[in-house]
Amino acid sequence: MNSKNYHQKKRFGQHWLVNKKILEKIKEIAVLNENDFILEIGPGKGALTAKLLDSKIKKLHAVELDNDLINLLNDKFNNNDKFSLQHGDILSVNLDSINKKITKVIANIPYNITGPILDIFIGRLGIIRNCNYEKIIFLMQKDVVDRILSKEGSPNAGALSIRMQLLSKIKKICDVPPSSFSPPPKVFSSLVVFEPINDNLRLDISLEKYIDKLLRISFNSRRKMLRNTLNSILSNEEMNELSESSKVCFKLRPQDISINQWIKLAENCIKIKK
């Protein structure tokens, strides 16, 4: 298929990056080397793919959902030994055979699957721990990136921002206007890099799961004070003990609690519940 004859499908949320400066910027911040095994999610017509394959990398494995693009991509990169292509939905496709080989994940994420993508790929930096990702580079909706970067006390702080910051160091590179895409979306995007927290600083798996539990309970009623959310799992006596041992005021709302305080709350809650 000729790429000029292909028309985007709205159901896939396709907004292809056409800004050459941003394409070059992604390649630059990836800091590619001959040992890199790249996973590219949703290569589209292959503009970014071509940039990455032009670098000294070991392998690029692309996952594409749109069946009409499979032939186009195969025709375009069939003669490149560094390229492999898998047809499937990134939210459900089996990557077990290559997951431990992947060093960097790069994607222009469709807005409609941003949340699930973050859960899968940033989540792997934590509980799953069966990956060697050095860096995850996502081009994604600006307001989601702004939420992820929110600190305690911000109205945008939430379970998403706390979980992402627990598992990775996050750096926003730049904002990207709608005109950089074809067709242009209605909102701005941001280019962001996630790097896994140093192994020595990673949380114990059971502790990480308990933090998730506390976040889920607390942010389900984010306008309520901690005392009025955690009472679903703690008695008044236990809450008083937890507040004192963690040095956290239970009159605070969840968005006002720092990451270190969430860690303390989870650590001490586990002790109390033993």
Curated annotation (Swiss-Prot):
User: Which reaction(s) does its UniProt entry say it catalyses?
Assistant: adenosine(1518)/adenosine(1519) in 16S rRNA + 4 S-adenosyl-L-methionine = N(6)-dimethyladenosine(1518)/N(6)-dimethyladenosine(1519) in 16S rRNA + 4 S-adenosyl-L-homocysteine + 4 H(+)
The protein's UniProt keywords, in alphabetical order, are:
Cytoplasm, Methyltransferase, RNA-binding, rRNA processing, S-adenosyl-L-methionine, Transferase
Q: GO: which molecular function terms?
A: 16S rRNA (adenine(1518)-N(6)/adenine(1519)-N(6))-dimethyltransferase activity; RNA binding
Q: Which Gene3D superfamilies match?
A: Ribosomal RNA adenine dimethylase-like, domain 2, Vaccinia Virus protein VP39
Chain residues that bind S-adenosyl-L-methionine: 15, 17, 42, 64, 89, 108
Q: Does the keyword Repeat apply?
A: no
| Pfam families membership | RrnaAD (PF00398)
Would the keyword Transferase be found if you checked this record's keyword annotation? yes
Location relative to the cell: Cytoplasm
EC top class, in one word? transferase
Query: What Enzyme Commission number(s) apply to this enzyme?
Result: 2.1.1.182
- What PROSITE patterns does the annotation carry? RRNA_A_DIMETH, SAM_RNA_A_N6_MT
Top-level taxon in the UniProt lineage: Bacteria
InterPro entries found in the cross-reference section: KsgA/Erm, rRNA_Ade_diMease-like_C, rRNA_Ade_Mease_Trfase_CS, rRNA_Ade_methylase_Trfase_N, rRNA_adenine_dimethylase, SAM-dependent_MTases_sf
Q: Which GO terms describe its cellular component?
A: cytosol
Function in brief: Specifically dimethylates two adjacent adenosines (A1518 and A1519) in the loop of a conserved hairpin near the 3'-end of 16S rRNA in the 30S particle. May play a critical role in biogenesis of 30S subunits.
Family note: Belongs to the class I-like SAM-binding methyltransferase superfamily. rRNA adenine N(6)-methyltransferase family. RsmA subfamily.
Q: What is this protein called?
A: Ribosomal RNA small subunit methyltransferase A
